[in-house]
Design a protein with these regions (language model features):
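C-terminal non-catalytic regions of proteins with extracellular/luminal or membrane-system context
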Residues: 1-173
């Protein structure tokens, strides 16, 4: 659902040949169902779709996300605990171990258009958790934020959105 389209950012202009794709969820696309629902295992993720349409994306960013967390950890929802099925992954934009100044400068030079991907999966037998269970460090422990639910933005996602909004002329979330 398109809620806002300020300055006609979408559809992308025919002149837009490059974009920066921010957000770990861009590298671990969500296509799923839970409980008695099902999902067609054949799908196209955002990065493949951009490539198919002839739009280049910044691989320095996507490589960092893939290194940070190589994929979604598989969880059997019927037998999982909330801290397993409700995990959120996102490095903080302010953490220079992930977002180096060089990377951020390169991204600004690469394109003035940014796409931010945020993902959640919940459904039958896989309820949205009342806390946030998140990993913000590569290989780090799961951190619990009791002040926010799974359906709210994480602090890291808010920081990312604030950064991208302040630094890019065209932003798609």
């Amino acid at each position: 659902v398109l809620v806002q389209n300020n300055d006609n950012t979408l559809p992308l202009s025919a002149d837009t040949k490059k974009v920066n794709v921010f957000g770990w969820a861009s590298t671990a696309w969500l296509g799923g169902g839970s409980g008695s629902g099902g999902v067609n295992a054949v799908n196209t993720d955002l990065l493949a779709a951009l490539t198919a349409y002839g739009i280049e994306y910044n691989t320095e960013l996507t490589d960092m996300y893939k290194d940070f967390q190589p994929g979604r950890e598989y969880v059997r929802t019927l037998s999982s605990r909330p801290e397993q099925s409700g995990r959120l992954y996102e490095p903080d934009i302010n953490n220079t171990a992930y977002y180096t100044q060089s990377m951020l400068d390169n991204a600004k030079s690469f394109s003035d258009t940014a796409v931010v991907v945020i993902g959640r999966l919940a459904g039958e037998s896989n309820d949205a958790t009342k806390q946030q269970y998140k990993r913000t460090e590569k290989g780090g422990d799961i951190v619990v934020d009791d002040t926010r639910t799974m359906l709210e933005l994480t602090t890291e996602e808010e920081n990312l959105l604030n950064y991208v909004g302040a630094n890019y002329a065209h932003v798609v979330v």
